[in-house]
Design a protein with these regions (language model features):
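Short, glycine- and small/hydrophobic-rich beta-strand elements in well-ordered beta-sheets
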Residues: 30-54
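Structural beta->alpha junctions
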Residues: 11-15, 60
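Short phosphate-engaging motifs
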Residues: 16, 51, 64
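Short, low-order "capping/linker" segments at domain edges
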Residues: 95-104
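K/E-rich alpha-helical interaction surfaces of small helical-bundle regulatory domains
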Residues: 15-35
Length: 104
C-alpha cells in the first residue's frame, strides 16, 4: 500500500507570520503528531510566496489517513486552529497518495 499524506496549506498575513510560526511549531504540530498518530510530519514556508505555510503529515496508507481525519482528535485540532486564527489566516487541505518515490 502506498504512503498517504495530509497537506494543510495556510496563507498567513504578514503581521501574523511570526506568531503563527511559533504557535504551529510549539503547539499545533506537536498536538497534531499526537492526535493523528502519523509516521512523521514536516513544515515549510514557501520560497515563492512568503505568506504561504505548508504542513505535511505522512501516514502508512490512505486507510490510516482516513481514520485520522474521522477521529475526535482531528475535530479538536480544527477547533484549536479556528479559535486561534479567526482571521488573518486561511487554509485549504488535501489528501495525497504517493505515486512514485526514487532515490539518486
Amino acid at each position: 500500500m502506498p504512503k498517504a499524506f495530509f497537506m494543510v496549506r495556510s496563507v498567513v498575513i504578514e503581521a501574523l507570520r511570526q506568531k503563527f510560526d511559533r504557535w504551529y511549531s510549539q503547539q499545533h504540530l506537536p498536538m497534531a503528531l499526537t492526535e493523528f498518530k502519523c509516521e512523521k510530519c514536516w513544515r515549510f514556508w514557501s520560497a515563492a510566496d512568503a505568506g504561504v505555510h505548508y504542513a505535511v503529515y505522512q501516514f502508512a496508507d490512505m486507510a490510516r489517513l482516513d481514520a485520522a481525519l474521522k477521529s475526535d482528535g482531528f475535530k479538536v485540532l480544527v477547533a484549536d486552529y479556528d479559535k486561534t486564527w479567526p482571521s488573518g489566516v486561511t487554509r485549504t487541505r488535501d489528501m495525497l497518495t504517493l505515486a512514485e518515490e526514487r532515490s539518486a
